């Protein structure tokens, strides 16, 4: 029985961030393609449209863990719901996106929580 696009999208929606990253890497390897080109082109197109209106969605990007790495890992786990291993990998792999498409208030709150834990954070 073949899976429909909706079935696949629902399965992906239930995955953790790390599982989605692993899926993308496996797809790149299997089909001998790179998702990097598509990702690089998308922000350029989006930036042109955003110039006319105020930005409503933000990405919270962890740029560094700072001195208190354990506290940063705890904050990442709290914000994302990731397991200890996945949160540690995200912190160790900085810069990494902690939240995507967050509202301005949600992004500011996440940034504050991460900075209080000792991380350096950017909103994009």
Curated annotation (Swiss-Prot):
Q: Name one Pfam family in it.
A: Ribosomal_L12
**Which cellular components does GO assign to this protein?**
cytosolic large ribosomal subunit
Q: In Gene Ontology terms, what is a biological process of this protein?
A: translation
* Entry keyword Flavoprotein: no
Annotated GO molecular function terms are: mRNA binding; structural constituent of ribosome
Q: Does the keyword Ribonucleoprotein apply?
A: yes
**InterPro entries, per database record:** Ribosomal_bL12, Ribosomal_bL12_C, Ribosomal_bL12_C/ClpS-like, Ribosomal_bL12_oligo, Ribosomal_bL12_oligo_N_sf
Keywords for this protein: Ribonucleoprotein, Ribosomal protein
Q: Where is the composition biased (Basic and acidic residues)?
A: 101-116
Q: Outline the segment boundaries, as ranges, of region: Disordered.
A: 93-124
Family, according to the entry, reads as follows:
Belongs to the bacterial ribosomal protein bL12 family.
Q: How does it assemble?
A: Homodimer. Part of the ribosomal stalk of the 50S ribosomal subunit. Forms a multimeric L10(L12)X complex, where L10 forms an elongated spine to which 2 to 4 L12 dimers bind in a sequential fashion. Binds GTP-bound translation factors.
Q: Which HAMAP family match?
A: Ribosomal_bL12
* Role description: Forms part of the ribosomal stalk which helps the ribosome interact with GTP-bound translation factors. Is thus essential for accurate translation.
- Give the protein's recorded name: Large ribosomal subunit protein bL12
Q: What is the lineage of its organism?
A: Bacteria, Pseudomonadati, Pseudomonadota, Gammaproteobacteria, Pseudomonadales
Name of the coding gene? rplL
């Amino acid at each position: 029985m073949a899976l429909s696009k909706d079935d696949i999208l629902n399965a992906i929606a239930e995955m953790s961030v790390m599982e989605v990253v692993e899926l993308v890497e496996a797809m790149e390897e299997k089909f001998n393609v790179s998702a990097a080109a598509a990702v690089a082109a998308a922000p350029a197109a989006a930036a042109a449209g955003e110039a006319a209106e105020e930005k409503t969605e933000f990405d919270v990007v962890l740029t560094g863990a700072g001195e208190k790495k354990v506290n940063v890992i705890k904050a990442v786990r709290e914000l994302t719901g990731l397991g200890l291993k996945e949160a540690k990998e995200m912190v160790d792999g900085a810069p990494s996106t902690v939240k995507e498409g967050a509202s301005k208030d949600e992004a500011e709150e996440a940034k504050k929580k991460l900075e209080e834990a000792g991380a350096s954070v950017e909103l994009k």
